[in-house]
Design a protein with these regions (language model features):
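Short, structured loop/turn "capping" segments at alpha-beta junctions
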Residues: 80-87, 101-105, 143-144
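Short, flexible loop segments at the rims of nucleotide/cofactor-binding pockets, characterized by
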Residues: 7-9, 94-100, 144-147, 172-173
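Amphipathic coiled-coil/heptad-repeat helices and related helical stalk/stem segments
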Residues: 16, 104-105, 153, 179
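Anionic-ligand anchoring segments at beta-strand to alpha-helix junctions in alpha/beta enzyme folds, i.e.
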Residues: 1-4, 115-163
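Glycine-rich phosphate-binding loops that contact phosphosugars or nucleotide phosphates
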Residues: 1-91, 123, 158-159, 164-179
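A short, well-structured juxtamembrane/interface segment
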Residues: 98-114
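Short, flexible, glycine/charge-rich loop motifs used to bind or transfer phosphoryl groups or to couple energy/partner
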Residues: 37, 107-111, 155-158
Length: 179
């Protein structure tokens, strides 16, 4: 038997619903979603609700909570222990970031403010965050942005780096780039 995991903020994404409708009955669907009464949740054999609350403009809260739920699911599927102390610390860090309570936030805003384009670079497990951040720049800040894998950036767009070029690098703690 196969498992497909579908992640959606609204649970009504056309592409996701059409995919599920075409799946054979021997494929198990697990959904990660913010809306308990959505079509996605109804079509799924199992569902994990993020409970991120109502989104005001962009799906920032849902993205963060879906990421957390997916991480917990991956840990469970791999029979990994979940350290509740570390998990609570991470939740507090995320809460502070969402509320703008981080010492580096104002400096980052100052550096990015007025830019005409932002390049976001990530690899591995943090590439999803880079992609979502590019979307947020375009939706919320009305600033053109693009997310690229580190290797993609190194073999092409690196040539466009010049004075005033803004790039944000996402590096996970196991990455050589992190150091």
């Amino acid at each position: 038997e196969s498992l497909i995991i579908c992640i959606s903020q609204s649970g009504e994404s056309y592409e996701v619903i059409k995919l599920i409708e075409k799946l054979s009955s021997n494929i198990t669907v697990l959904s990660i979603c913010n809306e308990k009464d959505s079509s996605l949740v109804k079509f799924s054999r199992y569902s994990l609700l993020c409970k991120a609350g109502k989104e005001e403009k962009t799906s920032t809260k849902t993205f963060i909570t879906c990421y957390q739920v997916a991480y917990l699911l991956a840990m469970k599927l791999c029979n990994q222990e979940i350290d509740s102390t570390q998990w609570h610390k991470l939740s507090k860090i995320i809460e502070n970031m969402v509320n703008g309570n981080t010492p580096w936030m104002s400096k980052a805003i100052e550096l990015i403010d007025g830019s005409t384009f932002v390049q976001l670079i990530g690899r591995g497990p943090v590439f999803a965050a880079a992609s979502q951040s590019a979307l947020m720049f375009m939706e919320a800040a009305h600033t053109p942005a693009s997310a690229l894998l580190g290797g993609e950036f190194r073999h092409g767009p690196l040539e466009m780096v010049k004075k005033g070029f803004i790039a944000i690098l996402f590096a996970h703690s196991q990455s050589e780039t992190y150091e």
